Amino acid sequence: MIEQLPKYMKRKLLILVTAVVMQMSFAQTESTFGDGEWFKFKMSYSGWLKAGNATLTVKETTLDNKDVYHVVGKGWTTGMIKWFFKVKDRYESYFDKTTLLPYKFIRDIDEGGHTKDIVIQFDQKDNKAYVHDKKKNTKKVFDTSPNIQDMVSTYYYLRDRLDVSKMKIGDEVRVDMFFDEENYGFKLKYLGEDIIDTDFGKIASLKFRPYVMAGRVFKEEESLTLWVSKDKNKLPLRIKADLRVGSLRADLEAFKGLKHPFRIIVDN
């Protein structure tokens, strides 16, 4: 059918198709985050006692000749809390810059004497996870779901790819995640829009309920609430968690390297 069109119409059609493809490509490549992004959080226990700090850092690098984001998350207790419950956690994820699928995950934690030192290599093509437990000196291979995510990459994947404009309050999304030697169906519930007071001022936000595994740390599946900025950055502004003993709150207190403008609501 196209071959039967006049030459000038073919040229116009080609220009139109090219323009559409360029727009689609632009929409797919305009990510919410990038190289050099850095967050710092302050944590408090049961609403008043300073508990610690956490940071998230994004760097561009290569891994096995693949262009990846390398994200490092650190968390540690401070002050009085540190004397009776010391926490020193480090999480790392190397995930593809285009697909946001992870190739390598590192979990090195010490939480009140509960320690883990694990490295996971993901084979996204053959759906395998190669788990090296350095503490136990064991190596195991597990089958994974297609397009599997790790604990860290899940957050960046949802932050970048979730289209909230198409969601209603109560809607849930599911992501296949590999955690602690098993496939885990991570779920996130949308709770609507909110305006919260922060160290930076009033911020329009989106509110979510990440489902967590109840057990040693969390009181129940719906123990966690997350607020992210209602802009292109999707900044993690606040996290509240109901623990088996007390509660924990993390608030964003510093940031740099944002890709998009950060908006604050100014009272008239």
Task: Show where each model-derived region lies.
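Generic detector of intrinsically disordered, low-complexity segments in short proteins
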Residues: 1-2, 267
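Hydrophobic-ligand-binding modules of eukaryotic lipid transfer/binding families
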Residues: 10, 25-27
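Bacterial N-terminal signal peptides
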Residues: 15-23
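Acidic, serine/threonine-rich low-complexity disordered tracts
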Residues: 28-124, 164-268
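Hydrophobic, well-structured mid-protein blocks that either form specific transmembrane helices
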Residues: 118-162
